Amino acid sequence: MIPLSDTIKNKLNYGLYIVSTPIGNLSDITIRAINILENSDYILCEDTRISKKLLDRYKIKSKLISNHKFNEIKNLNKIIEILKSEKIVSLVSDAGTPAISDPGRIIINECIKNKINIYPIPGPSAVSTAVSISGFSEKYFFY
């Protein structure tokens, strides 16, 4: 792992980082995603128990906040206040990219309304992985 130095952490912009996580193999995570999570003040997790397995693997000790479909509206004001206090907050889902068939849309829309910066951190994609071995021409693939 290539950790960010304190000087690089100071250069990270505060706001909400939408961090893609592995979709099956914990090794399928980008160095950038690890560094962002490692330097987050808070990580919003769809299921903290599942996220903790990934975070423990990479020795990431950021504070976790449960953020799933049953509590995301209830937690919204608290999270927006944290973001307005110029913190680095990451949002992760159990697997893949948050807000793509996972929680995240509500907090993202609220950040847009409040002019809070949002930064997407790309990662693995089940769709492109499946298409890559399908034998289909990309001309006939629509998403």
Model-derived features: positions:
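Glycine-rich, flexible N-terminal cofactor/catalytic loop recognition
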Residues: 2-70
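Loop/turn-to-beta-strand initiation segments
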Residues: 14-16, 85-90
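Short glycine-rich anion-binding loops that position phosphate/pyrophosphate groups of nucleotides
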Residues: 23-26, 94-98
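Structural motif
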Residues: 46, 67, 92-94, 119-121
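Alpha-helix capping/helix-boundary segments
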Residues: 49-51, 97, 126
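Acidic, metal-coordinating catalytic cores used for nucleic-acid/nucleotide bond scission
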Residues: 71, 95-103
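Glycine-rich, highly charged phosphate/nucleotide-binding loops
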Residues: 71-79
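Class I SAM-dependent methyltransferase SAM-binding "motif I" and its flanking Rossmann-like core
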Residues: 107-143
